[in-house]
């Protein structure tokens, strides 16, 4: 009886897995390229980024459409400034607010925008790299679809360089499917959620909406920007990074990974539409139900063992396929998905504790309040 119930739950899980990520949003292909003048300023907020910044700046070399590259140095104690200047970027020091109540990435981005000279503003995290010489051009071409207005954002493809980085697998997938634009289950409505690592806006729209000022009390600036743009009827679009835009998250160690995802999920989960969240939960539960079904089948008839093994293989193949859309994760961990599921639950519980009890999270030596 238990095995039968687990089999039914595993079946439901497989169906949910088919529905949570059955719509794709990719940047325009190279065959649709349009030659661009130098119309975009790249703005990079940076705090102690001497290790990651060279990869980003190197990937910007030879890109089409860039007017200038600005690095906003947010009190770095390392060689961030010197490295940026070596690559020809213009570096500005962050001017601290008198009340010191606004700081961090959103503060750096807004000050960067005030220094920019071009019509288009692209905000790029320091851990991002562009996968080929036409990546910026593809983003600009895609933005033309919305007539160079509104907010376009890209979630980079995750390429962890260390084994522990693959522990981020489920979180990366949830970041994409949780914005309600990649599932046929989503209610038809305007999108008010944006990804944070790469965002593109016209400067008129940016200052009309007050840009990153909207995020001065937000942990995830993409949410605040998306809500503001949508509230004034400006389009908000989201895209997968694929081979065009990539990043390596939390290279400083597993502790930074834990802190980073705790910060992200402390406010992110409530943005997902209920029906999509239910489907996500049911799909993730398939990691446990398919595994338990397989383990219990050891003590049952051969036919049951075959069916249980088949369900585990089907779920695992689906699990692997969905995750490889958003990152190059360890195949070992993807196949041993219960390990990833347990780690996900640990972070989610830790995030819930911060959200409802401590009301703050730590990131890069700073404490951020959760509203």
Positions of the model-derived regions?
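N-terminal membrane-anchoring/stem segments of glycan-assembly enzymes
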Residues: 1-34, 344
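A conserved acidic beta->alpha catalytic loop
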Residues: 73-82, 96, 129
